[in-house]
Amino acid sequence: MAVSELEVDGVVFPPLARPPGSAHAHFLAGAGVRGMEIGGHFIKFTAIGVYLQADAAVSALAAKWAGKPAADLASDAAFFRDVVTGEFEKFTRVTMILPLTGAQYSDKVTENCVAYWKAAGVYTDAEAAAVDKFKEAFGPHSFAPGASILFTHSPAGVLTVAFSKDSSVPESGGVAIENARLCEAVLESIIGEHGVSPAAKLSLANRVAELLKGAAHAGGEPAAEPVPVSV
């Protein structure tokens, strides 16, 4: 199956991307909005695209999930956990729909992470230091609509944080944070069991199910086909 681009609330996610500092191309696995019901209205804050390493993700996920319908993947927390923890790179692009400060974003993300780690009894000095470095990376930034936050999640447990004033992806740069729990937690907060973007989760389940089906038949990796489709 060819991989198409997705448009989410006017934000276009191309079918392929190469994260800052990565040697690997990534395909668009899914995309959707993050929003919240406020006063009876659904307010959209960000559009989120999740990319997976093209030369490793499909084969890694196929062993357990190939042949299963999208509905099964979408309803199974273990599938999303396998995406988060899989031995392949992931790349997440968060593009603003409404303006947001770096402090607002980083405080909310780390607040949820720390609460989870403390409840699980795994919050150590290493996690505290990683959280501080994460907040420092965001401190001087404010994000206008259209600006993007870029996360590269390494299977070695390194989270690279970069920024763009638009939807472009810089070839290099960013802040590298070596902490496996934080690296996983950022993606887990988006597509995990209590992920903030159900739309991105559903999109990812639908597209990966088709890719696994196509890979099983063709024995190959996804190719790019830049044709807009709905989420």
Curated annotation (Swiss-Prot):
Keywords: Flavonoid biosynthesis, Isomerase. The keyword Nucleus does not apply. This is Chalcone--flavanone isomerase. GO terms for molecular function: chalcone isomerase activity. Part of the biosynthetic pathway for all classes of flavonoids, a large class of secondary plant metabolites, many of which are brightly colored. Belongs to the chalcone isomerase family. The record marks Y105 as: Important for catalytic activity. Substrate binds at T46, N112, S189. Pathway: Secondary metabolite biosynthesis; flavonoid biosynthesis. Its EC number is 5.5.1.6.
